[in-house]
Amino acid sequence: MSLITDIYAREVLDSRGNPTVEAEVYTEAGGVGRGIVPSGASTGEHEAVELRDGDKDRFGGKGVLKAVANVNNVIAKEIVGMEVTDQIAIDKAMIALDGTPNKGKLGANAILAVSLATARAAADELQVPLYNYLGGFNAHVMPTPMMNVINGGAHSDNKVDFQEFMIMPVGAPTVREAIRMGSETFHALKKALEADGKVTSVGDEGGFAPDFANNEEPFEYLIKAIEAAGYKPGKDVAIAFDVAASELWNDEDKKYKLHWSTGEEYTTEEWIEYLSDIIAKYPVVSVEDPIDENNWDDWVTLTNKLGKKVQLVGDDFFVTNTDYLAKGIKMGAANSILIKLNQIGTLTETVEAIEMAKEAGYTAIVSHRSGETEDTTIADLVVATNAGQIKTGSMSRTDRLAKYNQLMRIEDNLGDVAKYKGIRSFYNLSEQAKQDIENR
């Protein structure tokens, strides 16, 4: 193996046209790796800090020249000369160099860019695919995609309170077929929306964001689209949705408010019943952030009620942080974690969170952010860790499709070794729950 000889960062743009950090790592044996950091719109308050310049005269304050300078002038001095394959030592060195619990000094965007670029440089030097470098010979499970085809909440300008409505091709035999099923359902949905005179422009993650009469109408359109594409709802293609409940929670009143639609308010008990009714009515297999991120006891209450029936995913709740995840596991809160690289800020900590979840019987869903790039690391990471599920947007926008295309390449490379588990990737649910989802 060889040592890192140079690190260089620059400011580039993400899928929303906002600045982000790109880093390149070079080794003495000729290895080169590049990593680009994504950015979120709906963010958890406990996420690692994304360092922005704050200069209102430049990119509206969203520039990242400070983070870029931290890579070129601070991180590079520490990391150049280290062994490129010693990912853990490199990540720990950057964490120590920052010295804050939330990476607020150097910026998680600066640290993550170098972390990702390091792994790619090592894989390039060894002349192996990234998934193979990260996961070894056991990397073989192709993920069940979670495709965001209808946007609401903070991801749109419509009157829908829930942030994302997704389809999951749980009955597909391969990831290539799963992507085909998702694409066909996506186009069937577009036709159904157009037939009813609804807008079919797409949002940040490639999903449609038309106006709807209420929060249940998107589910009805998903059912219609799945059937129009020739599939059975629940059995072939299941439904998932992201509530993003922290966006709806009023901490003063201690109530959830549907402020994008009707303005109705719910106590926690009423809210849990409201969500339970929706889950019972439609073939829902997964619900993300159904409870406010700071209401731990309420998460436990919901998990006790629904945890064997449906996947309950902590995103803002866990923020890819092993401390929060360990607390949730101990309390019995949620049964799944959404994995976002930039929530925690290094590849090492991300893999630690995935492994902790799997050991506890929680599923781990490797996820994109709403502000994405052409970087396809998450496609390799989900296969490397055999996580089993990926959330990376809809069937439009190149920044989303880049990940799906990479998954198909990986499946081709793996050949007969590749295994797509579909509904079996939900090892956190009972067999009866899976049957019930198929029959709704």
From Swiss-Prot:
Mg(2+) binds at D242, E288, D315. Keywords: Cytoplasm, Glycolysis, Lyase, Magnesium, Metal-binding, Secreted. The keyword Secreted applies. The active site is at E205, K340. (2R)-2-phosphoglycerate binds at Q163, K340, R369, S370, K391. It is found in: Cytoplasm; Secreted; Cell surface. One of its GO terms (molecular function) is magnesium ion binding. Its cofactor is Mg(2+). SMART domains: Enolase_C, Enolase_N. The keyword Metal-binding applies. It comes from the Bacteria. Pfam families: Enolase_C (PF00113), Enolase_N (PF03952). Pathway: Carbohydrate degradation; glycolysis; pyruvate from D-glyceraldehyde 3-phosphate: step 4/5. InterPro entries: Enolase (IPR000941), Enolase-like_C_sf (IPR036849), Enolase-like_N (IPR029017), Enolase_C (IPR020810), Enolase_CS (IPR020809), Enolase_N (IPR020811). GO terms for biological process: glycolytic process. It catalyses: (2R)-2-phosphoglycerate = phosphoenolpyruvate + H2O. Binds a second Mg(2+) ion via substrate during catalysis. GO terms for cellular component: cell surface; extracellular region; phosphopyruvate hydratase complex. Its EC number is 4.2.1.11. Belongs to the enolase family. Catalyzes the reversible conversion of 2-phosphoglycerate (2-PG) into phosphoenolpyruvate (PEP). It is essential for the degradation of carbohydrates via glycolysis. This is Enolase. It comes from Limosilactobacillus fermentum (strain NBRC 3956 / LMG 18251) (Lactobacillus fermentum). The lineage of its organism: Bacteria, Bacillati, Bacillota, Bacilli, Lactobacillales.
